Amino acid sequence: YMLLGSFLSPLRNKRTDEYGGSLLNRARLLFEVLDAIKETCGREFPIILRMSGSERDPQGNTVEDMKRLIPYLEQHGVDCFEISGGTQYERCNKIIPCHGEEEFTNLKEAREIKAVATKPVITVGKILDAKLAEDVLEAEEVDGVVIGRALLADPDFVEKAKEGRYEEIAPCAACGVGCVGEQTKRRPASCVINPLAGRELEFEEQPAKEAKKIL
């Protein structure tokens, strides 16, 4: 989203040399970085590229632009695509979708990119429902999902889902208050759902002395 994303985006890249203008020119620096990684680390070194499936701006890159770019990125050594959305500037709420955004925010673009890619495609963006995530994977809509904030809310999210204990998962509110909000203030991440998040070494989790039925 920062340097390489700015070069790739027509919203930010106003250069008139070989690094600006057309889609492939805007991607030139990214291609060079990918080539340098493979040259330095070896062809077997895996590269996962996180990219916006769509910048969601009338003047920005669209999913069609990204689909055109996929074969070139594979030629330059990308082994897996992680599909996000938006930009660091105009559509930051799409990068970290909050409670007003739909779940699986970038799934539509990820599906379209998977249709043209020969490498695995994974998606990220407000993936909060474990059962829905399993359904998406079982339907092979994408090859993988990336879960972030939901693991702050409940570090046992994956284990509970694996055991079918969906109702026991503490649900992420997608509020962005403790995780994103605290980081913007240069403070350690926390979570309004999980008071132990970011403080695991300060407090030891203890079982309740007496069980209570809340609802």
Protein language model annotation of sequence segments:
Residues 1-215:
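Flavin-dependent oxidoreductase catalytic cores
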